[in-house]
């Protein structure tokens, strides 16, 4: 049981190391820092961006490093697609 958990942790660590190495080559240091900040606030959004960037890099569609400004544009596009609008309606008030 513990051996399986240890192997699982090691496998996840290896995958994260590979992802980090790829992101290091395709992102400028400023863009990497921004992605790290996003990961702290919205981990699911950062994960989606990381996976998308890695897929683009592996398919050869990224020719130069992605700058901070380009990452901002990507974040804005994904944020507008995944943004949820909340509407609060008050049915009854406690005072008259």
Swiss-Prot record:
Gene3D superfamilies in alphabetical order: PDCD5-like
Source species of the chain: Sulfolobus acidocaldarius (strain ATCC 33909 / DSM 639 / JCM 8929 / NBRC 15157 / NCIMB 11770)
Full protein name: DNA-binding protein Saci_1468
Keyword Manganese: no
One function term, GO molecular function aspect: DNA binding
A GO term from the CC aspect: cytosol
UniProt keywords, alphabetically: DNA-binding
HAMAP family linked: dsDNA_bind (MF_00026)
Coiled-coil blocks: none
Similarity-based family: Belongs to the PDCD5 family.
Residues spanning the signal sequence: none
Pfam families in the cross-refs: dsDNA_bind
């Amino acid at each position: 049981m513990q051996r399986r958990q240890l192997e699982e942790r090691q496998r996840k660590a290896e995958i994260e190391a590979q992802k980090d190495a790829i992101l290091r080559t395709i992102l400028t240091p400023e863009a990497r820092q921004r992605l790290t900040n996003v990961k702290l606030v919205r981990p699911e959004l950062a994960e989606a961006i990381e996976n998308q960037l890695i897929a683009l890099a592996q398919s050869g569609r990224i020719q130069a490093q992605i700058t901070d400004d380009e990452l901002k544009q990507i974040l804005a596009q994904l944020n507008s697609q995944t943004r949820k609008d909340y509407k609060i309606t008050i049915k009854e008030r406690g005072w008259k």
